[in-house]
């Protein structure tokens, strides 16, 4: 196949791919997505559509420097959250290396920006699956593809397509019970999944009608990670601090850590 034939073949494939994406999102949304995401991301999104994982894409529900989260539906109309990691900045790359290099699951760290963001997405998916299997309430993981993570959408029961509020914006009605729930999740995470969230606070716990759901699992590390004790202590301290501000008579940091690690 000559250069001209290859170019024509590529252009025809791009046209077919774009037509397929038009079926799951309106043209304004697709144009916005094309402005933000590169071709490999669009190809991965196309594959998820072609594989029957995503049926319809709606708008952005959360946007940050590292990722955007979209409300979507699967082909059967069930709500999904589609988290798409953006091109990795040098600052983000420096920030995540410590969560990867000490993790035995990712002993061959690739520092190429694209490969690193794919690894980070895969890491979050695997952490979600381990936490979910251990009985921790997290968004159910569905699929990871390149820099795209598909999972359960934790929505506001009152308005479809709107995410449930964060704990920082919607304090629990029964703080004592909520504290017990979160500490139980940390215990299960450590002793069943053998993980530490490593970034736990009221900023990444959702409150859906008093059901607490922990999100943002990219930073979670295995118990064998050299910094796991430091991360665990920080997680517990953050939770105790938050609930103490709500007026709860919280246990001491030492007491909680001893209970979790069994010493």
Model-derived features: positions:
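Long, low-complexity intrinsically disordered regions enriched in Ser/Thr/Pro/Gly
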Residues: 1-21
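Conserved kinase catalytic-core helix
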Residues: 112-138, 144-145, 162-198, 203, ...
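Short, glycine/acidic-enriched loop or turn micro-motifs at the edges of active sites
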Residues: 86, 155, 202, 207, ...
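Conserved ATP-binding subdomain of kinase catalytic cores across diverse folds
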Residues: 33-163
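C-lobe/activation-segment region of protein kinase-like
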Residues: 171-178, 191-197, 208-263
